[in-house]
Amino acid sequence: MPRLSVQEIDQALKGLRNWRFENGELVKEFKFADFDSSIRFLNMVQPVADSLDHHPDLCVYYNRVIVHLTTHDEGGVTDLDLKLAQKLDELEKMVH
Protein backbone atom coordinates (compact mmCIF):
# COMPACT_ATOMS: atom_id res chain seq x y z
CA MET A 1 0.00 0.00 0.00
CA PRO A 2 1.66 3.26 -1.06
CA ARG A 3 2.46 6.03 1.40
CA LEU A 4 0.05 8.97 1.24
CA SER A 5 1.14 12.53 0.52
CA VAL A 6 0.73 15.25 3.13
CA GLN A 7 -2.10 16.70 1.03
CA GLU A 8 -3.90 13.34 0.93
CA ILE A 9 -3.50 12.94 4.68
CA ASP A 10 -4.76 16.47 5.37
CA GLN A 11 -7.83 15.77 3.23
CA ALA A 12 -8.50 12.45 4.97
CA LEU A 13 -8.18 14.03 8.42
CA LYS A 14 -11.24 16.14 7.67
CA GLY A 15 -13.31 12.95 7.90
CA LEU A 16 -11.79 11.75 11.18
CA ARG A 17 -12.59 12.98 14.69
CA ASN A 18 -9.67 14.59 16.57
CA TRP A 19 -6.88 12.80 14.72
CA ARG A 20 -3.79 14.79 13.82
CA PHE A 21 -0.76 14.22 11.60
CA GLU A 22 2.38 14.52 13.70
CA ASN A 23 5.95 13.40 13.01
CA GLY A 24 4.86 11.23 10.10
CA GLU A 25 2.10 9.44 12.04
CA LEU A 26 -1.60 9.73 12.72
CA VAL A 27 -2.10 10.43 16.43
CA LYS A 28 -5.17 10.61 18.64
CA GLU A 29 -5.74 10.79 22.38
CA PHE A 30 -8.85 8.88 23.42
CA LYS A 31 -10.32 9.92 26.77
CA PHE A 32 -12.50 7.62 28.85
CA ALA A 33 -14.29 7.74 32.19
CA ASP A 34 -11.79 5.57 34.04
CA PHE A 35 -9.03 2.99 33.78
CA ASP A 36 -11.49 0.13 33.27
CA SER A 37 -12.90 1.88 30.21
CA SER A 38 -9.41 2.41 28.81
CA ILE A 39 -8.63 -1.29 29.17
CA ARG A 40 -11.99 -2.26 27.67
CA PHE A 41 -11.11 -0.12 24.64
CA LEU A 42 -7.68 -1.79 24.35
CA ASN A 43 -9.29 -5.22 24.47
CA MET A 44 -11.58 -4.18 21.61
CA VAL A 45 -8.66 -2.82 19.57
CA GLN A 46 -6.73 -6.08 19.53
CA PRO A 47 -9.07 -8.20 17.34
CA VAL A 48 -9.65 -5.30 14.93
CA ALA A 49 -5.91 -4.72 14.56
CA ASP A 50 -5.35 -8.45 14.06
CA SER A 51 -8.07 -8.65 11.40
CA LEU A 52 -6.32 -5.89 9.43
CA ASP A 53 -2.86 -7.27 10.25
CA HIS A 54 -1.99 -3.70 11.24
CA HIS A 55 -1.08 -2.89 14.82
CA PRO A 56 -1.00 0.57 16.42
CA ASP A 57 1.43 1.87 19.00
CA LEU A 58 -0.54 2.43 22.19
CA CYS A 59 0.20 4.33 25.41
CA VAL A 60 -2.17 4.05 28.38
CA TYR A 61 -2.42 6.72 31.09
CA TYR A 62 -5.24 5.79 33.47
CA ASN A 63 -8.28 7.12 31.56
CA ARG A 64 -6.44 8.08 28.36
CA VAL A 65 -5.16 5.97 25.49
CA ILE A 66 -2.85 7.63 22.97
CA VAL A 67 -2.73 5.89 19.61
CA HIS A 68 -0.02 6.30 16.96
CA LEU A 69 -0.63 4.89 13.48
CA THR A 70 1.92 4.50 10.70
CA THR A 71 2.81 1.84 8.17
CA HIS A 72 6.45 1.09 8.95
CA ASP A 73 7.03 -0.86 5.72
CA GLU A 74 6.04 2.21 3.70
CA GLY A 75 7.74 4.76 5.93
CA GLY A 76 4.59 6.77 6.60
CA VAL A 77 0.81 6.89 6.60
CA THR A 78 -1.17 4.73 4.17
CA ASP A 79 -4.84 3.98 3.52
CA LEU A 80 -4.52 1.13 6.02
CA ASP A 81 -3.78 3.64 8.79
CA LEU A 82 -6.85 5.66 7.81
CA LYS A 83 -9.00 2.52 7.81
CA LEU A 84 -7.79 1.56 11.28
CA ALA A 85 -8.33 5.13 12.54
CA GLN A 86 -11.96 4.97 11.39
CA LYS A 87 -12.46 1.62 13.10
CA LEU A 88 -10.93 2.91 16.35
CA ASP A 89 -13.34 5.86 16.28
CA GLU A 90 -16.21 3.36 16.00
CA LEU A 91 -14.86 1.38 18.95
CA GLU A 92 -14.60 4.55 21.02
CA LYS A 93 -18.35 5.07 20.66
CA MET A 94 -18.96 1.57 22.00
CA VAL A 95 -17.00 2.27 25.19
CA HIS A 96 -18.66 5.60 26.03
Curated annotation (Swiss-Prot):
Cystine pairs: none
DNA-binding as UniProt keyword: no
Catalysed transformations (reactions): (4aS,6R)-4a-hydroxy-L-erythro-5,6,7,8-tetrahydrobiopterin = (6R)-L-erythro-6,7-dihydrobiopterin + H2O
Enzyme class (EC, first level): lyase
One family name in Pfam for this protein: Pterin_4a
GO BP field: tetrahydrobiopterin biosynthetic process
InterPro entries, per database record: PCD_sf, Pterin_deHydtase
Gene3D superfamilies: Transcriptional coactivator/pterin dehydratase
Enzyme Commission designation: 4.2.1.96
Residues spanning the membrane: none
CDD domains in the cross-refs: PCD_DCoH
Entry keyword set: Lyase
The keyword Membrane is assigned to this record: no
GO MF, one example: 4-alpha-hydroxytetrahydrobiopterin dehydratase activity
Cross-referenced PANTHER family: PTERIN-4-ALPHA-CARBINOLAMINE DEHYDRATASE
Family statement drawn from the similarity comment of this UniProt entry: Belongs to the pterin-4-alpha-carbinolamine dehydratase family.
Protein name (database record): Putative pterin-4-alpha-carbinolamine dehydratase
Taxon lineage: Archaea, Thermoproteota, Thermoprotei, Sulfolobales, Sulfolobaceae
